[in-house]
């Protein structure tokens, strides 16, 4: 009986459900879809979504569509089309779909990462980018801050010589200090409880954000109890309490003649808007807006960088010959009398190539945060109506056999010329930080952190698989960030480093 009722309801829904505008022949070819549920019944149920979407290109081509519930969504898996969306028509596709889970993270669309492309978003993005200008010179120079934290991390690891360590925890704490310096001009000792609190709510939020949150597809499901949403709310509450405390301290110390961090810039912008009575901007600088922008720096800057550093270590454990080549470069070009600097990138070519290859083979976000068409537009030969969601499958771009030789193989040398003496870009199908109006604002920071941290680690330590332990799993866990499964590494102080420090009397076993 119930089966007949359900069948009848489906038939009626199909007959009377409003036909979408996207039925136009010029709209990208679509997966099958049903009323209400869309294409969900026809999507693969196992494996990583970015890989499944890549495989669907074999049948549907480099651009195709599907329906997530009733929402028309276009999937892009070719770099020419991706660059059209991100760069050539970046403003037309700079919108962000509003989702229940991301709304909780962004105080309902505030900040930068998940905000729609309105005036407030543009203003906060501009101010966030301007904050990096504060860290160009002097003691606040960004490279100086990074090197100090990298050295502190290495000093901590010295106390674990010849031990098996999960590097993710100390790296997370170290990178958090860099973000705290940029946002608040503060830093913390490794054992400070505030760092543990930040790690707890950051990882808690990430664990709640995956590709199976049906409430983002069917928002009406919020009328029912939802454990995931409750967890997100709890973690966001803790996050906001921490950031509010830091914000209030910045307000107390604020000096309009001494702007030293991102929060100072936002406070100053709020004061200017209030003093000039510019009503267009006054509403953009509530504490909620400021907290969301600062929160985006924490959410997008810490776990992403930590994850990539762990991926780099994992691939070096799988490819020890690459690690030895990098250490040889370090020994020959830097030695042991000074800390590596970002200028050394011109000489540590294998290290830079390794970083680029890891960002290719395991992109931070295999599917970039979805975009939304702000107006009726087009991609290639296809018409794209306003409000259509557009997903760039970065995994497809980075694993296209037409663009990359043996794309599933780790080959840093692909980013070097035939002589190994110059860095190259072997394909335009490479967008590890996105591009256009929605490009990652922390790209410069991330590249410096990745280079300097790995250089410092390999200058001082040998990193090996612990005796009897398995190799790190390279499959990964794709959430908002492509995480690697936890693993341990044996940390051993290099003999060459010991000898060099002993000569100048700084080595203490």
From Swiss-Prot:
Keywords: Endoplasmic reticulum, Heme, Iron, Lipid metabolism, Lyase, Membrane, Metal-binding, Microsome, Monooxygenase, Oxidoreductase, Steroidogenesis. Pathway: Steroid hormone biosynthesis; Steroid biosynthesis; glucocorticoid biosynthesis. Regulated predominantly by intracellular cAMP levels. The 17,20-lyase activity is stimulated by cytochrome b5, which acts as an allosteric effector increasing the Vmax of the lyase activity. It is found in: Endoplasmic reticulum membrane; Microsome membrane. One of its GO terms (molecular function) is steroid 17-alpha-monooxygenase activity. Heme binds at residue 440. InterPro entries: Cyt_P450 (IPR001128), Cyt_P450_CS (IPR017972), Cyt_P450_E_grp-I (IPR002401), Cyt_P450_sf (IPR036396). It comes from the Eukaryota. Gene3D superfamilies: Cytochrome P450. It holds the Pfam family p450. Its EC number is 1.14.14.19, 1.14.14.32. Its main location: endoplasmic reticulum. It catalyses: a C21-steroid + reduced [NADPH--hemoprotein reductase] + O2 = a 17alpha-hydroxy-C21-steroid + oxidized [NADPH--hemoprotein reductase] + H2O + H(+); progesterone + reduced [NADPH--hemoprotein reductase] + O2 = 17alpha-hydroxyprogesterone + oxidized [NADPH--hemoprotein reductase] + H2O + H(+); pregnenolone + reduced [NADPH--hemoprotein reductase] + O2 = 17alpha-hydroxypregnenolone + oxidized [NADPH--hemoprotein reductase] + H2O + H(+); 17alpha-hydroxyprogesterone + reduced [NADPH--hemoprotein reductase] + O2 = androst-4-ene-3,17-dione + acetate + oxidized [NADPH--hemoprotein reductase] + H2O + 2 H(+). GO terms for biological process: glucocorticoid biosynthetic process; hormone biosynthetic process; progesterone metabolic process; steroid metabolic process. Its cofactor is heme. GO terms for cellular component: endoplasmic reticulum membrane. A cytochrome P450 monooxygenase involved in corticoid and androgen biosynthesis. Catalyzes 17-alpha hydroxylation of C21 steroids, which is common for both pathways. A second oxidative step, required only for androgen synthesis, involves an acyl-carbon cleavage. The 17-alpha hydroxy intermediates, as part of adrenal glucocorticoids biosynthesis pathway, are precursors of cortisol. Belongs to the cytochrome P450 family. This is Steroid 17-alpha-hydroxylase/17,20 lyase. It comes from Peromyscus leucopus (White-footed mouse). The lineage of its organism: Eukaryota, Metazoa, Chordata, Craniata, Vertebrata. The gene is Cyp17a1.
């Amino acid at each position: 009986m119930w089966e007949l009722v359900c069948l009848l309801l489906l038939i009626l829904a199909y007959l009377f459900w409003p036909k979408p505008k996207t039925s136009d022949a010029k709209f990208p070819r679509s997966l099958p879809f049903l009323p209400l549920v869309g294409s969900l019944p026809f999507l693969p149920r196992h494996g990583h979504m970015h890989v499944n979407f890549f495989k669907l290109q074999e049948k549907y081509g480099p651009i195709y569509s599907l329906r997530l519930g009733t929402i028309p969504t276009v999937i892009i898996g070719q770099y020419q089309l991706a660059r059209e969306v991100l760069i050539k028509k970046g403003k037309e596709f700079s919108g962000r779909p509003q989702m229940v889970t991301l709304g909780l993270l962004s105080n309902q669309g505030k900040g930068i990462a998940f905000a729609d492309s309105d005036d407030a978003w543009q203003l906060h993005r501009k101010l966030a980018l301007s904050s990096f200008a504060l860290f160009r010179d002097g003691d606040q120079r960004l490279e100086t801050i990074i090197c100090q934290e990298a050295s502190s991390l290495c000093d901590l690891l010295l106390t674990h010589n010849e031990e098996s360590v999960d590097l993710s925890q100390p790296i997370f704490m170290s990178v958090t200090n860099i973000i705290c310096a940029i946002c608040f001009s503060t830093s913390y000792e490794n054992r400070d409880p505030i760092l543990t609190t930040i790690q707890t709510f950051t990882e808690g939020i990430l664990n709640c954000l995956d590709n199976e949150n049906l409430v983002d597809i069917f928002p009406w499901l919020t009328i029912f109890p939802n454990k995931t949403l409750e967890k997100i709310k709890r973690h966001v509450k803790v996050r906001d309490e921490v950031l509010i405390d830091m914000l209030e301290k910045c307000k107390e110390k604020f000096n309009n003649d001494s702007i030293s961090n991102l929060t100072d810039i936002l406070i100053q912008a709020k004061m200017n808007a209030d003093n000039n009575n510019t009503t267009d901007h006054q509403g953009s600088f509530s504490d909620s807006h400021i907290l969301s922008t600062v929160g985006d720096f924490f959410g997008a800057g810490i776990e992403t960088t930590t994850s990539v550093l762990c991926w780099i270590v994992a691939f070096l454990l799988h490819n020890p010959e690459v690690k030895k080549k990098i250490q040889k470069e370090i020994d020959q070009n830097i030695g042991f009398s000074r800390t590596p600097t970002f200028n050394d990138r011109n000489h540590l070519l294998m290290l830079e190539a390794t970083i680029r290859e890891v960002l290719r083979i395991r992109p931070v976000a295999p599917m970039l945060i979805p975009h939304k068409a702000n107006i009726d537009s087009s991609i290639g030969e296809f018409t794209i109506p306003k409000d259509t969601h557009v997903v760039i499958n970065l995994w497809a771009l980075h694993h296209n056999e037409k663009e990359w030789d043996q794309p599933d193989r780790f080959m840093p040398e692909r980013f070097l010329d035939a002589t190994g003496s110059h860095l190259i870009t072997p394909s335009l199908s490479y967008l590890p930080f996105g591009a256009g109006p929605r490009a990652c604002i922390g790209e410069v920071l991330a590249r410096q952190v990745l280079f300097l941290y790995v250089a410092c680690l390999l200058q001082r330590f040998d990193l090996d698989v612990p005796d009897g332990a398995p190799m790190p799993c390279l499959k990964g866990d794709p959430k908002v960030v492509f995480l690697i499964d936890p693993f341990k590494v044996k940390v051993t102080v290099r003999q060459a480093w010991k000898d060099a420090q002993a000569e100048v009397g700084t080595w203490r076993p």
